[in-house]
Each structure stands twice: as structure tokens, then as C-alpha cells.
């Protein structure tokens, strides 16, 4: 039987605190002695490309990179942006965010991206506006990563348009539309050396007027402590922590013959950051 069991390879089944293996010989699933734990909910990209939330203790099968899927195991992280869900709740802007300047004719509207709420700013006439997170407190002298997904087919902007600024955090930094990669991702690593309190401003008018008929659309903003970005953590009023995924007790005599056997695994690291990894 061991030669016919596949964990993954496009065939996944999960239940609370465990994974199931697919038996390609008879087309059903068999339990394996994997112990899986995570004491919090978490998000994952499903087969339809949508970001969905799974409950505490439920293994995450992520389809971000291909149709086969992969078991996603991540360290504990927190999203320090207090209102990342960008919910307008019938208003004219996302809850918890403030509009800065507000010069000229402009609008903000609710969009949807990968099953999550998004925001689109339109600068109708020449003027200036942006969305501000409000005060955020993070740990000084520690590397952090900011990741924002821009919806490129909804954006009308020039490469040199300024779209993001850090206020305080020990330094004033501005990023341009050209800093977004071809997939619409803006990912920034930074280290607040002195001041651990600041805010983020996102929009076409973060530091100067923008010409009319331009737009900027974005979603799932996340600011976390660490040298690389992890899966999205929704927040609605305060920072939220996702607890680490833990999966162990694999490859024992219940799966492999007690005297010999081979365990084959395809594994991809979340980041090449020099930390130790064990299989």
C-alpha cells in the first residue's frame, strides 16, 4: 500500500489537526500520522485563486503557485496595519483610514480583489489626496516587510508618480508607481532604526499634486516583522497575529516499512534568508 499513497500531488484532503493521503490504487483517502497544529485562523489561496480564511487547527493547502497545491507552513506573524480589510461599510472611504489633503475633485470606491475588499482612488481633476493608516507602533531596530497588492488593470498612473510614503519610523521614504513589480506587488523591507511609531500614506497625492484622470487601486496591505512577506492576515481595528503552523510525526514506521523505505518530498522555502530548515 505504501507505494500507492500520495500526500498532495494535486490530491488533498484535510480535517482538523491532520492531513489525509490519496490512495491512487483505489481512489480514496487514507489517514496518515501527521500531527498538525495552529492555534489561530489563517488565510490561504484556494483552487479558484481566491483568498479564504480557514479555522484554527486546519491545514492550509495553498494554490498560489500552481494547480497542484502545497501544504503551507509559516512562522507566527502579525499584521500591524490596523484596518487592512479596507471595508467601506457604505461610506466614502475604508473604515479606520483618513483622507489627507483632499484637494481637487477625487473619489474612493470599493472594489474586490481575489475575494477580498479593495480600494480604488480616482483623481478626477488635478489635486491631491491619499489614505493614511493612522499611528502604527512597531519594534525599532528590527527588520520589517510591507507588502501591498496593486490591481494593475484598474490603475492609470505614470512610472514616476509617487504612490506610497512612510511618515516617521525614523525616516521619510517615498516609493513610485515604477517600484511595483509586473504582478502588481509592492514589497519593501525596512528597519526603523530609531523611531518605532509612524504611519503609511497610500495614494496618488502622497507628497504633491497629481494630474487629473489618474487612478490607483490596491488591496490586502500587510506590515509584518520579518525579512519576507507571508500570507495575508486580515485586521479590523487592531493588529492581528497568526500563530505558527506546526506539522510533525511524519515518515515513521506507520508510513514507511520499519526496516527500509523512501520518503520523497518536493519542498519550497518561504525565503532564502539563511535560517535553518529541517525535514
Where are these regions (language model features)?
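Extracellular and organelle-lumenal recognition/adhesion modules and their flexible linkers in secreted
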Residues: 1-279
Amino acid at each position: 500500500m505504501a507505494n500507492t499513497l500520495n500526500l498532495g500531488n494535486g490530491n488533498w484532503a484535510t480535517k482538523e489537526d491532520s492531513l489525509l493521503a490519496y490512495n491512487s490504487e483505489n481512489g480514496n483517502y487514507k489517514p496518515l500520522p501527521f500531527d498538525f497544529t495552529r492555534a489561530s485562523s489563517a488565510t490561504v489561496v484556494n483552487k479558484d485563486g481566491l483568498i479564504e480564511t480557514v479555522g484554527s487547527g486546519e491545514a492550509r493547502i495553498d494554490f498560489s503557485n500552481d494547480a497542484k497545491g502545497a501544504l503551507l507552513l509559516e512562522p507566527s506573524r502579525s499584521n500591524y496595519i490596523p484596518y487592512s480589510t479596507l471595508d467601506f461599510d457604505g461610506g466614502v472611504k475604508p473604515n479606520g483610514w483618513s483622507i489627507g489633503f483632499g484637494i481637487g475633485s477625487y473619489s474612493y470606491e470599493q472594489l474586490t480583489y481575489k475575494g477580498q475588499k479593495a480600494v480604488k482612488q480616482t483623481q478626477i481633476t488635478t489635486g491631491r489626496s491619499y489614505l493614511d493608516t493612522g499611528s502604527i507602533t512597531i519594534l525599532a531596530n528590527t527588520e520589517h516587510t510591507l507588502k501591498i497588492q496593486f490591481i494593475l488593470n484598474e490603475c492609470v498612473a505614470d512610472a514616476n508618480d509617487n504612490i506610497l510614503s512612510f511618515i516617521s519610523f525614523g525616516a521619510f521614504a517615498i516609493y513610485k508607481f515604477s517600484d511595483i513589480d509586473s504582478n502588481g506587488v509592492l514589497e519593501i523591507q525596512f528597519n526603523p532604526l530609531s523611531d518605532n511609531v509612524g504611519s503609511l500614506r497610500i495614494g496618488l497625492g502622497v507628497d504633491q499634486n497629481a494630474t487629473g484622470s489618474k487612478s490607483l487601486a490596491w488591496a490586502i496591505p500587510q506590515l509584518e516583522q520579518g525579512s519576507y512577506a507571508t500570507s495575508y492576515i486580515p485586521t479590523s481595528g487592531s493588529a492581528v497575529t497568526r500563530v505558527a503552523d506546526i506539522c510533525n510525526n511524519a515518515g515513521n514506521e506507520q508510513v514507511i516499512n520499519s526496516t527500509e523505505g523512501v520518503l520523497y518530498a518536493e519542498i519550497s522555502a518561504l525565503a532564502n534568508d539563511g535560517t535553518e530548515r529541517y525535514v
